Swiss-Prot record:
The keyword Amino-acid biosynthesis applies. InterPro entries: MTA_SAH_Nsdase, Nucleoside_phosphorylase_d, Nucleoside_phosphorylase_sf. It catalyses: S-adenosyl-L-homocysteine + H2O = S-(5-deoxy-D-ribos-5-yl)-L-homocysteine + adenine; S-methyl-5'-thioadenosine + H2O = 5-(methylsulfanyl)-D-ribose + adenine; 5'-deoxyadenosine + H2O = 5-deoxy-D-ribose + adenine. Catalyzes the irreversible cleavage of the glycosidic bond in both 5'-methylthioadenosine (MTA) and S-adenosylhomocysteine (SAH/AdoHcy) to adenine and the corresponding thioribose, 5'-methylthioribose and S-ribosylhomocysteine, respectively. Also cleaves 5'-deoxyadenosine, a toxic by-product of radical S-adenosylmethionine (SAM) enzymes, into 5-deoxyribose and adenine. Thus, is required for in vivo function of the radical SAM enzymes biotin synthase and lipoic acid synthase, that are inhibited by 5'-deoxyadenosine accumulation. GO terms for biological process: L-methionine salvage from methylthioadenosine; L-methionine salvage from S-adenosylmethionine; purine deoxyribonucleoside catabolic process. The gene is mtnN. This is 5'-methylthioadenosine/S-adenosylhomocysteine nucleosidase. The keyword Transferase does not apply. Pathway: Amino-acid biosynthesis; L-methionine biosynthesis via salvage pathway; S-methyl-5-thio-alpha-D-ribose 1-phosphate from S-methyl-5'-thioadenosine (hydrolase route): step 1/2. It holds the Pfam family PNP_UDP_1. Its EC number is 3.2.2.9. Keywords: Amino-acid biosynthesis, Hydrolase, Methionine biosynthesis. It is an enzyme of class 3 (hydrolase).
Amino acid sequence: MKIGIIGAIEQEIRKIKEIINNLKIKKIGNIKIYTGTFKKIEIFLILSGIGKVSASMSTTISINLFQPDFIINSGSAGSLNACLKIGDIIIPKKTCYYDVDLTNFGYSKGQIPEYPQTFKTNKNLREILKEIAVEFKFKFLTGLLVTGDSFIRKSNCIKKIKNQFSSAIGVDMESTAIGQVCHNFKIPFIIIKSISDLSDNNATSHFEKNIPIASLKSSKLVKLLLKKISSQNSI
């Protein structure tokens, strides 16, 4: 089995690198690719860089070079739900752009032409993750994760997003782009995000303080997922 894992920044992949055997590194442009194994699984861990374009490039490279059975996007997110606190986990059912608007042409808010409005994560992987999260007592929510090329750090931005996507529980800068590429190439994907900040006026300082916590939590869940999959050798 071959699994691609994508994280935007070094903190989000550092702990994952530690569990990969025979670790090797290569670069394509500014994108770092770590290859190796975890038990019987071939791992392709990509440091994508921040934002939708970087995430899209990294996902396309992963699929074209390595043909993974599925892709994991691991890292941090801002909370849009009062129940989600620092270190809590989001296991999204689906993801959507909050900064795309072609509604004047009859498309739904967030929808790219020729694509669905939302991109759904793989149900089997999602259910496995939920079982693991319950077993190991992670606090988590499932729902809609929204993506855009801005770090949300103001309460009025939260209000605007929630007015347009009332069911959104979190916000990030990469996941929907990864979902769109996976949809295009028919590759299953799953998202594991841990809350680093509350997307409010204190978001910048909270992110800087809490990114180690969020990265540790999301990486731990990735490791547990890999263990589970390696033991059953299927999804």
